[in-house]
Amino acid sequence: MFLNTKIPPPVVTILFAIMIFYFSDNFPSVDLPFKIYISIFFILLGFFVTFSSARNFKKKDTTVNPMKPNETTKLVTDGFFKITRNPMYLGMLLFLLGLSIYNGLIVGLIFLPLFVGYITYFQIIPEENAMLEIFGEEFTLYMKKVRRWI
């Protein structure tokens, strides 16, 4: 099973964060009241969702490596995985949302959908194909119950 990309999702997230900071000066911005608090909230929420979901993988003694989904040994469906099939990527998106709010939000309207599209096409869909091969009907039922993002 080959993924459509060889760039780990945390690296993709960092690249998008750099683009948000770099391009934020070239786009109009909205100065929200309390933007520092709102942005910190989303950044911390993103870290919490990402790392608590990764901890679920460790508790189940299965791989957290997004580049090797075929090494997954257990289907994780508890914690944040009850509400989204991809809480770690959702956490990364929340982190980028926090950065976008801090940088005036408008630039995020461009980069956040690009991040979702990129991660979905190059990472999530190949991971789902690997999970279908490994877990079959169990993963199919999980896909019917729980949405890809939220």
Describe the predicted segments one by one.
Residues 80-83:
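Generic transmembrane alpha-helix motif of multi-pass integral membrane proteins
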Residues 86:
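Extended, alpha-helix-rich binding/interface surfaces that flank or overlap catalytic cores
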Residues 1-78, 90-150:
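Membrane-anchoring alpha-helices and their flanking helix-loop junctions
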